[in-house]
Design a protein with these regions (language model features):
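Alpha-helical transmembrane segments and their helix-helix packing motifs
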Residues: 1-267
Length: 267
């Protein structure tokens, strides 16, 4: 039932491992691209949200954030939150090793951070209409996120990446316009529900940092948010989606671990 999709995810995990080993610069550039693409989506939805009544703001922001994951998937790039699912399935299928997975994930996260901050810098240098006023939506939301309780961030992060990985999973299983519909619905649910995405937050925090933010908005608060949200994102991507669909597949239908060693996947 899910064998073909798992095979595609495992093959992508092997591709990610090869790219990381054989072309580290290319891997980091591709990771930075993913952070930038998500950042472009964040700038769009906060530009719109800043103009809207709070009663309709979550719906409109959610309905327009699909551009972020559409760019990541269709243009192609390396997104940390998607990698949590891909690499877990790659390990279970024997396409990569545990060591490769845990070496790649932090590199992807850092590459995403580079791209996220770069886009925020460009926006700031370009005038950044959202940034000069400390009551702007960018600043109020960023401050609220950095002062939220750890467990709230963790579980909102888990719910968020469950939806993001579902969007990616369904995009793999569908063709044509159905891919875009799957992405759109899942990201609408994620944004409108107020969940937490580590890479999306990177751009939001950078935007606020480069603007006229409240004094209570601090680097320690940013670190607090990104730590717990990243852990929550990893839980749902690796466990709910990766292990979930692996064990939802009958044992006889699961891909058999490849005979090659992990080192061979990087050739």
């Amino acid at each position: 039932m899910f064998t073909d999709t798992i095979n595609k995810c495992a093959a992508n995990a092997a591709r990610i491992a090869r790219l990381s080993a054989n072309n580290p610069l290319g891997f980091w550039v591709s990771s930075a691209m993913a952070g930038a693409y998500v950042g472009l989506g964040i700038i769009l939805i906060f530009t719109l949200g800043n103009l809207l009544d709070p009663s309709v703001r979550p719906l409109v922001m959610g309905a327009t954030f699909g551009i972020a994951l559409t760019l990541v998937i269709i243009a192609g790039s390396e997104l940390f939150t998607g990698h949590t699912m891909f690499l877990t399935l790659g390990v279970k299928a024997g396409a990569i090793s545990h060591g490769q997975m845990w070496a790649i994930l932090p590199q992807t996260w850092l590459g995403n951070l580079v791209g996220s901050v770069f886009v925020a810098l460009l926006y700031s240098w370009g005038g950044g209409s959202l940034l000069p006023v400390d009551t702007s939506l960018v600043h109020t939301v960023a401050l609220a996120k950095t002062s939220a309780p750890a467990m709230a961030l963790f579980f909102k992060g888990a719910l968020c990446n469950w939806l993001v990985c579902l969007a990616i999973w369904m995009a793999i299983r569908t063709e044509g316009a159905a891919k875009f519909i799957a992405i759109w619905w899942c990201l609408l649910a994620f944004i409108a529900s107020g969940y937490e995405h580590s890479v999306a937050n990177m751009t939001l925090f950078a935007l606020s940092w480069f603007g006229h933010h409240n004094e209570a908005f601090t680097l320690s608060g940013i670190g607090h948010n990104l730590l717990w949200v990243t852990l929550g994102n990893t839980l749902s991507g690796a466990v709910f989606m990766g292990l979930g669909y692996w064990y939802a597949t009958p044992k006889a239908e699961r891909p058999q671990p490849a005979a090659h060693t992990a080192s061979e996947t990087t050739r």
